[in-house]
Amino acid sequence: KADLGQGTTGRYHGLLHSGGRYVVSDPGSATECAEENEIVTRIHADAVEKTGGLLVVTPEDDLEFSDQWVEGAKKSKVPFEEIATAEALRREPRLNPGIKRAFAVQDGSVDGWQMVWGAAHSAIEYGAKVMTYTAVTEIIREGDQISAVVAHDLKHDERIRIDCKFVINTAGPWAGRIAELVGCHDVDVVAGRGIMIAMNHRLVNTVINRCIYPADGDILVPVHTVSIIGTTDVKADDPERLAIPRNEVQQMLDSGETLVPGFRDARAVHAWAGARPLFKDKRVSSTDTRHMSRGMSILDHGSRDGVNGIVSIIGGKLTTYRLMAKNVVDVMCEQLGDDRPCRTADEAVPGSTVGKNYLITHRLGENEERRAGTGLVRGGDPKAVASSKKIDNQVICECELMSRKMFTDLLADQPDATFDDLRRQLRLGMGPCQGGFCSMRATGVAVEEGTIDAERATGLLRLFLKNRWIGLWPILYGEQVRQTALDDWIFQGTFDVEHLPTPQQEVEL
C-alpha cells in the first residue's frame, strides 16, 4: 500500500543472519538462515556486504551459555570458528576488552531496499507489474473460489480491479487483515515492535552479536556508512503506529556500551521502529514476542477455511525471504497443477549478475570512474569532456556521495516518487545532517529539471522533513541537537517552509 520496502522489510537493522543468533532459541530458523545466507549473498550480490560476524561473551554474559551455543551451532549446521579474544580485538579494536570468548560466523549486512528492488526488477523481467501506493480494499470470491482483488490507487484516487485465479497473502503484520477480507478469520499475527538507532559512522566493520539467548540490543551491524544497534521486542497493537519510547532509546545506548565502550560518545543520527510479523505460538504468552518463533508458517485457506485460491505466509526473516517465496509459490503451483522447478537459488537478480558484492567504497569508485570518463583526472579521455555534462558529477548529498545524475536519472524513471521513495534507493538525507542541506538541493534540482512544479516540490520537501523529524525527536542529545537546530533555523528562518503553498492532495506515507 506504500513504497517497496517501506514496511517491515526496510525497517530493520540490516543484518543478513548466519543463523548463529538462533542456534539455541530456534534451531530450525538457524538452519534456514545458514543455508539461505550463502544463496542470498550470491543472488543479491549488489545488496550484500560480506562483513563477517563475531559472537562474543562480554563481561556481563554467562560463560556457560557459550558451551550450549557451540553444541547448538553444530546441531544446526551453522558454520563457525572459535578464535582467540586477542584476535577478535585485533579485528575490532573498539570491542569491549573484557570479552571472555569469541566465535567468527558468516553474518553480513544487507541493504533491504536494494534487495527488494532487485527482486522486483527480476519479477518485472518475467512479466510482473509492480503497483506501489495501492491498497487492497476487497477480495472477491465466487462461491468458495477467489476471483478478483479490488484495490485503491492512493496517488491517483482510482479504483482498480484485478481478476485472478490465485492470491498469495504476504502482507506481513497486516496479513491477518487481508485474510479477513475474504472471510478467513483467526489468522493471529502478532506485531513485534522493535526500535533501532543509527550512529553516524562505523564503530565496527564486522557484525557484533552478544553470545546470549536473544535479547534486546544485542546486535551491532555496520551498514553502509553507519552502525546500527538493535533491537527491542514489544507487542504492538497496531503496526501502523510504532512508537520510539525514550526509555528504549536509553536501553539501546546502554547495550551499545556493553559491546563497544564509549558507544554513547558517538553521535546518534536517526532512530526508527519496525514490526515483525510473528505467527501466534500457543506455547508463549500473546505479549511475549521475543520468544515467538522466527520461522515461517504457510496457511492454506482452502483446507483451513474452505476458501480456495488463497494462501497466507507469515513469519520468517529477510534472510530467508527467498525460501519463503519458494515454499509458498510451490503450494500455489501444486494447487494450480503447474509443475515447474524453482530457479531462484541459482539465478541472480538484475544488478547482481556479475557476482560482485557491495563494498562501502563503491560510490567512491563509481565517482572516480565517472571523472576518469570525462577527462577530469589523469588517465581520462580528454575528448570525452566536450560531450559530457560536468554538472552531472555535482554532489547533492555529501554524506552519502549522491551525485546529481544519480538523482535525476531515478527521478526521470519514477516521476511520481516522493523524496522518501528516492531516499530509500539513493540514501538521500541519511547522513548526519538528516537532509538539512541535501534535501533543499534535491528539491531545487527537481524543479530545475522540470519534473515537478514549485507547489508540489514544497509539499514533497515538507513531507520529507516531517518523516526525518520522526526519527530525530527521540535522540536529540549531543551534537545532533546542534545539527537539528541549525537545520530548523535554515528551513524556518530562511525558507519559511511551514507557510509555503502546497498541493491540495498529497499521499503522506
Where are these regions (language model features)?
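Glycine-rich FAD pyrophosphate-binding loop
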Residues: 1-11
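Dinucleotide-binding Rossmann-like beta1-alpha1 core, especially the glycine-rich loop
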Residues: 13-91, 364-368, 483
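Flavin (FAD/FMN) cofactor-binding and adjacent substrate-gating region
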Residues: 57-126, 131-132, 138-145, 150, ...
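Core beta-strand elements of the Rossmann-like FAD/NAD(P) dinucleotide-binding domain
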Residues: 155-166, 170
